[in-house]
Regions:
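Glycine-rich phosphate/pyrophosphate-binding loop shared by adenosine-nucleotide-utilizing enzymes
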Residues: 3, 53-57, 83
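A short beta-loop-alpha structural element at the N-terminal edge
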Residues: 3-16
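Hydrophobic adenine-recognition pocket in adenosine-nucleotide-binding enzymes
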Residues: 8, 88-93
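Active-site rim helix/loop that mediates acceptor-substrate recognition in acyltransferases
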Residues: 25-51
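Conserved acyl-donor/pantetheine-binding loop and adjacent beta-alpha core of acyl/acetyltransferases
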Residues: 59-87
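Conserved acetyl-CoA-binding loop-helix of GNAT-fold acetyltransferases
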Residues: 90, 96-109
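Conserved GNAT acetyl-CoA-binding A-motif
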Residues: 111-121
Length: 121
């Protein structure tokens, strides 16, 4: 029952889109075009897998990324270098099971070697 964090694969994007759009009001909805843009441009786009099933995903961008989020722009105006977590989504049936904790540990390990600041909304 271990959690595996790994890079997303192209054939999983439909499942990621469904996870995102079923996550509730705290997560902005995505369409397929925007999700594919994330896939092509995000510096960090990883999924969590538990028991062979998709359990969630996290998308992040470095400060030099061409990302169109107003929240990202706010950080860009204030910090010269940072890594921005755009969204983290955990499948409802996997919440409370350590998936979010595993994601934050992984993204922190990734970002701390590359950026002086880790940011999110």
């Amino acid at each position: 029952m271990s959690i595996v964090i790994r890079d997303v694969r192209a054939h999983e994007l439909d499942s990621v889109l469904a996870l995102n759009n079923n996550a509730g009001l705290a997560i902005l909805p995505l369409d397929s075009a925007k999700l594919h843009r994330f896939y092509e441009t995000a510096e960090y786009f990883r999924v969590a897998e538990r028991d062979g099933n998709l359990a969630g995903f996290l998308v992040g961008f470095g400060s030099d990324s061409d990302h169109d989020s107003s929240n990202f722009a706010w950080f860009r105006e204030r910090y010269p270098q940072f890594f921005y977590i755009d969204r983290i989504v955990v499948a409802s049936r996997r919440r409370g099971g350590g998936v979010g904790r595993a994601f934050y540990a992984d993204v922190q390990s990734y970002a701390e070697l590359r950026y002086p600041q880790l940011a999110c909304e």
